[in-house]
Amino acid sequence: FDHIFAEHQNTRLIIATFASNVDRVQQIINSAYKYGRKVVVEGRSMVNIISTASALGYLNVPENTLIEIDQMKNYPPEKMVLITTGSQGESMAALSRMAADVHRKVTIQPNDTIIFSSNPIPGNEKAVSKVINELSMKGAKVIFQDVHVSGHACLEEVKLIYGVVRPKYAIPVHGEYRHLTAQKHVVEDLGIPKENIFILASGNVL
């Protein structure tokens, strides 16, 4: 996790993982402490397991690192990391409620970075994709480990095509919203002005 924290020091981090993966939670807490971030734990199972693991000595939380969710407003977003349930797209999990704008305490912001720190269990792919797309539509950056899609152009091939064609305008097509957003970021990095890149829904007229 260290490289993710190092590369995203100006955004709020929201990390979804299995509550039972105490070792992963420890890694997140260690990185948060290293980079001077406060940690909020959200999701009932996550809160319960972290509390139990800490009490039994399986989890080491540095003093003054863990705060309550109501205290988030006292800190700038870039000094916060939320560890949350919902990595499998469960409809009532904390991250799913954030994505659907029905979470009472957390509102997704365009500058947020959300990390899915687990691959979807077979059968959950559709639910996970739905949450990722909802988060992307809110302008948040989503980091998802399972990025391989067989038969599609890889990142360097996409860069090559844009480098050869050098278009004035770009309209990413063919993919879910998160794929279009990812291509948009690539195009921006290649020097095409943000105002010349359009993500359109079916039926939109440009």
Q: What role is predicted for each listed range?
A:
Residues F1-L206:
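Acidic/His-rich, metal-assisted hydrolase cores and their charged scaffolds
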